[in-house]
Amino acid sequence: MKSLKELSLRIKNIRSVQKTTKIMQMVSAAKLLQSQKKLLNSKLYVSKLHNIIFSLMLSVDQELLAKILNVSNDGSYLVFIIASDRGLCGNFNSSIVKFSQERVNKSIANGKKVDIVFLGKKAFDVGKNRFDSKSILKIENSKGITLKHVEALVDGIDLSKYDKVKVFYSKFYNTFTQKPMLETIKPWSKDSSLIDSSLAGPTTDYGYEYEPQNIEFILKSLVQDYVVIALYSALLESATSENSARMVAMESANRNTKEILNKLALLYNRSRQAAITTDLIEVIGGAESL
C-alpha cells in the first residue's frame, strides 16, 4: 500500500489536472457558442449563393453549362484536409485523416494526380506519411483563418489546372455528433453537404435581370466565388466540430478525475486509519509491557 505522503501528493496533482480540464471545458464551451453563430451565418450565405447559382443554371442550355462548369474526369485533383492545430479533442483529428486517407489513396491508385493542402497542424502531423501524394502543403492556425485568408489562399492557387477540388472536413450536427465529410467544390454540384435547404429557400427561376447582360460571365464569377465561400464554410464546420469535441473530451476528463479522486480519497482514509490503528496497537503493546 502506498504511503500517506505519496497518496497526498497524487491527490494534489490530480486536483491540479482537474482545474486545468475544467478551465479548458469552459473555454471550449464559450468558443463553441461563438463558432456556432459564425457557422449559422456562413451556412445561410452559402445556401443562398448555392440556390442562386442553381436558379441561374435553369436558364442555361446544357452546352453552355458544361463549358461554365468545365466538367472533366481527367487531369489532377486538389484536396483540402481540414483538422485542428491542437490536440485534446478526442479522435477529431485522427478520424478525418483516416477518412480522407482511404479516399485520396484510392484516387491516386486509379491514376489521378492529387495535390494535398493540410489546413491544421495536427492534420499534417498525423497524415504526412499516410498519403501517397508527393505534393503536400501545410497551413497552420486553420481555426483562425478568416474569409480574407481563404480568398488569398485560393487566389494563390491556380485552380484552372485542377479538374476537381475536394474538401475533407468534420461536419457539425450537434454537441455529441460530428462526422467526417467529403465535399466537391469544383466543379459546382447541385448536391452539397454544406448547405441547408431550409435556409436556402425554394429553388426556382426568379427571372433575374443581369448586369452585365452576360449570364456566362455572371455564372463563372459566382461559381468562382462559391469555391471560396464553400471552403470557408467547411473551415467553420470543422472549427465548430473541434470546439464541441474538445468540450466533450474535457467533460469526460473531469468525470474521470472525479472518480479517481474519490477512489484515492477512500484509499487515503483507509491508509490513514490503518496507520492510526498500528500506532494504537504499538502504544497499547508498549503500555502492557511496562
UniProtKB/Swiss-Prot annotation:
InterPro entries: ATP_synth_F1_ATPase_gsu (IPR035968), ATP_synth_F1_gsu (IPR000131). It comes from the Bacteria. GO terms for cellular component: plasma membrane; proton-transporting ATP synthase complex. Keywords: ATP synthesis, Cell membrane, CF(1), Hydrogen ion transport, Ion transport, Membrane, Transport. It holds the Pfam family ATP-synt. GO terms for molecular function: ATP binding; proton-transporting ATP synthase activity, rotational mechanism. CDD domains: F1-ATPase_gamma. It is found in: Cell membrane. The keyword Transport applies. Its main location: membrane. One of its GO terms (biological process) is proton motive force-driven plasma membrane ATP synthesis. It is a peripheral membrane protein. F-type ATPases have 2 components, CF(1) - the catalytic core - and CF(0) - the membrane proton channel. CF(1) has five subunits: alpha(3), beta(3), gamma(1), delta(1), epsilon(1). CF(0) has three main subunits: a, b and c. Belongs to the ATPase gamma chain family. This is ATP synthase gamma chain. It comes from Wolbachia pipientis wMel. The lineage of its organism: Bacteria, Pseudomonadati, Pseudomonadota, Alphaproteobacteria, Rickettsiales.
